[in-house]
């Protein structure tokens, strides 16, 4: 697939997602990084978002709960280029009924080349990067060209 570029603004749109067994860890991480995260636009699946808002007072765009379609909502926002970073503390040791949604979410984050943190260490590396609060240009699929080629029936 051909690539193009996308510029991500210094003020990021960050999605926060966590499995039930990881919510305490994500909340602790958010609390430790509250001041920096408050400078960005936060989105989250339902339960996670409400817990973050309650614990920090930061406004969060709360989507549906993950198992009720929230993971897919986040994936759609990624595809629409409305999410710049995904912080997803997931539990690799416990299966969840919506595992296919989880795989799809991680796949879309990879397709659209956005940074993903899946645990505290990667989240620390990501938020500690000078790029976290800087404008940055990333390579993404050239969807317009992709559609043009698919519609060219010659």
Swiss-Prot record:
It catalyses: dihydroxyacetone phosphate = methylglyoxal + phosphate. Its EC number is 4.2.3.3. It comes from the Bacteria. Pfam families: MGS. Gene3D superfamilies: Methylglyoxal synthase-like domain. The active site is at residue 71. GO terms for cellular component: cytosol. Substrate binds at residues 19, 23, 45-48, 65-66, 98. Keywords: Lyase. The keyword Transmembrane helix does not apply. One of its GO terms (molecular function) is methylglyoxal synthase activity. Residues 1-154 form the MGS-like domain. GO terms for biological process: methylglyoxal biosynthetic process. Belongs to the methylglyoxal synthase family. Catalyzes the formation of methylglyoxal from dihydroxyacetone phosphate. This is Methylglyoxal synthase. The lineage of its organism: Bacteria, Pseudomonadati, Pseudomonadota, Gammaproteobacteria, Enterobacterales. The gene is mgsA.
């Amino acid at each position: 697939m051909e690539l193009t570029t996308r510029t991500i603004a210094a003020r990021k749109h960050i999605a926060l997602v966590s499995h039930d067994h990881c919510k305490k860890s994500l909340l602790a991480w958010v609390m430790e990084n509250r001041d920096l995260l408050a400078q960005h636009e936060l989105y989250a699946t339902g339960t996670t978002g409400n817990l973050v808002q309650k614990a920090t007072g930061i406004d969060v765009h709360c989507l549906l709960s993950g198992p009720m379609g929230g993971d897919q909502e986040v994936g759609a926002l990624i595809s629409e280029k409305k999410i710049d970073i995904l912080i997803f503390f997931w539990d690799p040791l416990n299966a969840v009924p919506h595992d296919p949604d989880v795989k799809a979410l991680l796949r879309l984050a990879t397709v659209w080349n956005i940074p993903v943190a899946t645990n505290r260490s990667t989240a620390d590396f990501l938020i500690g990067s000078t790029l976290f609060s800087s404008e940055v240009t990333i390579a993404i699929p050239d969807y317009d060209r992709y559609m043009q080629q698919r519609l060219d029936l010659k």
